[in-house]
Amino acid sequence: MLLASVILLLLDIPWLLLQGATFSKTVSDIQGSPLRVKWWAAIPVYLALGYLLVQQKSAVGAAASGACVYAVYDFTTLAMFDKYPLYVAVLDTLWGGVLFCLGFLALSACKVGLRL
């Protein structure tokens, strides 16, 4: 599970860097102050995501699970906050699917490599 969590974090970093300005502006619009990330809170998030990833049996299943997890967050946020853009919810949900699919493939490759 720890390996899966690390893989997901490493795969997520480029997305977070690419979308950082968008998310920062969105949060600032919603809360009226700049985004300040509590990095320690990412630990239980990635551990939970890693746990979910290791339960997957296929890349397609992983993609579906990732999209579902991200959709729960994004569309709940969309439902609660007027200033949360629909396009952010859709893009981030799609990213959740891509992230979990890539994570599943990377984790599978690591498992094969560890058996050699």
Please annotate each region the language model reported.
Residues 1-116:
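Juxtamembrane/disordered regions of integral membrane proteins
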